[in-house]
Amino acid sequence: MAVVRVVGAGYACLMSSRTIRILDLFAGAGGLTAGFHEASDRFRSVAAVELDPAAAASYSATFAKTDVFTGPIQDWLARADMPADVDVVVGGPPCQGFSALGKRDAADERNSLWRQYAEVLTHVRPGYFVVENVPAFGRSRQYQDFLTATRPGGFLEDYALEHRVLNAADYGAPQVRKRTVVIGHRRDLEAPGFPEATHAPEAAGGLLPYRTVGEALLGVPAVPDMDGRFDEVRTRVGDRELPGAFSPRELHFSRAYRPISRERFAAIPEGGSRADLPDELKAPCWRRHTTGSMDVMGRLRADRPSVTIRTEFFKPEKGRYLHPTEHRAITHYEAALLQGFPDSHRFIGSRTAIARQIGNAVPIPLGAAIARRLLEVL
């Protein structure tokens, strides 16, 4: 195995240059893999599994050397030709069944997808694995079942795991996004622990200040300038042609708004929301109900990280997604920047499908921080 001698401040150590092979489950458009690739060119995605054809196509377009399976993970498991010599398995099983967003459903079949993830571990036997999910996952029955499987007599007894809720803003993402991160390791290997925060609300103790919306969007044209591009490029996916593949920059297109919407946007100050609207611009339901989320039709602040970027960020009525200074929602490009996607990433699909890929992704800086932590033991 090749090694590289690294000389630091007063010390020298040996660091392996061996390729670290990644298997990405429930891969989406590849946000978590992108974070690993950003952390080190030692990481290489060798296989990925994704149900959604558009997201799988985006993954393939970005990581051209990866074997991407499009379909249910159960079908992939039935093929019995899993990749060999996998070092790290990563992935985020769909979380809607135990998400804090909306009603939780203990019977939701998506809650059992962690079992398919765990079954993959028994087949490929990686040294390490990472599961990313909503904050509620660590308090769920599903996580407890996962933990029980690692105890003596369990089908994952050769592994140990622990979890923490991490905030992407603490690792350099210009976005407040809290996620449960589970990191597991084979018991014969060193436990990696969790990445230390690199950023804080204010610079102190060696930590950098949070990255802001203004920093992330610096230099982005105020007026979206890619409206025509979306209809010009097509990629064949199965028996269909889908829009793409697009770089993030090519996703800076506009959305048509009604005159009343533009009036409302213009009346909302930076950091404000529908609560700041005069009565004549409020919808009847807003006048009747003064409680509820104040993020609805909210405007981002340029001097702070953004709120969590979700899948409908292009709809101001769905949250705090108005541009800090422009009278419009953030564009797909701006949302991708707030998620940390590099311009080398590629997206395929309808506008809605690409928004879903962006909003469902693990922020790249968070994935990179996890990857760098794993590098310390790999």
Label for each model-derived stretch:
Residues 1-7:
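Extreme N-terminal basic, low-complexity initiation segments
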Residues 79-86, 98-288:
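Class I S-adenosyl-L-methionine
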Residues 237-378:
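C-terminal target-recognition/interaction regions appended to catalytic cores
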Residues 93-96, 187-188, 314:
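Short glycine-rich anion-binding loops that position phosphate/pyrophosphate groups of nucleotides
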